[in-house]
Amino acid sequence: MVMGHGLGANREMGLDRYARRFAAAGMAVLVFDYRHFGASQGTPRQLLSIGRQREDWHAAIAFARTLRGIDATRIALWGTSFGGGHVLSVAPDDAYIAAVVAQVPFTSGLSSALAKGPISTIKVATIAAVDLLLGPIRRKPIGIRLAGRKRAAALMSAPDVPEGFRRLTDESETYEPKVAARVAFSALFDAPGRRAKALKMPVLYALCDDDSVAPVKSALRAAERTKHAVVKRYPAGHFDIYFDEVFEKTVYDQTEFLVSVLRP
């Protein structure tokens, strides 16, 4: 099992809970940080590049296959939020990926922008444009907040975002609250859900009905295009899935799915 987190997040932010459960079920688990974030190298720090992060997924998969005792044909990918979009995009490129778990996945930048509303989107676009123009000149990215309330100049902005994201960031010693703003433009036009038709392996979509960050309707459209899709829906918000009863239910469902697919 290869696991990666979401937007501006690192492996300290809740992934250990999932990894322990999967390991207890008999799976070997590799959890990694994207370059420029957390424990990984890469400068400038907090540079969020969609292309580089997907390259990191391929690198992590390749590394997992070098580990002793690992069956190279029974590797699963687990991604959450922005990472959920990454696994939908990366998995079709590897014919030997056995299963995918896409938890509250980012499937359409346009859908997420519409959920944010015009005020927040305009604020974010303005800062992103300044970063694109001036960042290279000053040799240092211009940052934008990852989380904020509705209408805030933040990549994720909704009433439940500040408190929900804070619960995750409190678990990390390396978390930084801002990333290079330029990613807003590439994220807007990114649509990992479009690759759903190319997914040949079983895919579990773990979706929250009250998701204010990764709209559930967009994820359901991706699931409909997935040949071997399993959809699990929970009456919860985007960040609720990492904690308490919702976590217990989702990790049970995910473990059951993974064991059934990966069992020799």
Language-model segments: which ranges?
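Short beta-strand element of the alpha/beta-hydrolase
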Residues: 1-6
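The serine-hydrolase catalytic nucleophile loop
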Residues: 7-20, 34, 217
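Catalytic nucleophile-loop/oxyanion-hole region of alpha/beta-hydrolase
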Residues: 11-14, 37-72, 76, 243-250
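Conserved alpha/beta-hydrolase
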Residues: 19-41
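Alpha/beta-hydrolase-fold enzymes
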Residues: 88-168
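Short beta-strand/loop motif that positions the catalytic acidic residue
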Residues: 199, 205-207, 211
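Conserved alpha/beta-hydrolase "acid-adjacent" motif
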Residues: 212-218
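Catalytic active-site module of serine/aspartate enzymes centered on a nucleophile-bearing elbow/loop
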Residues: 229-264
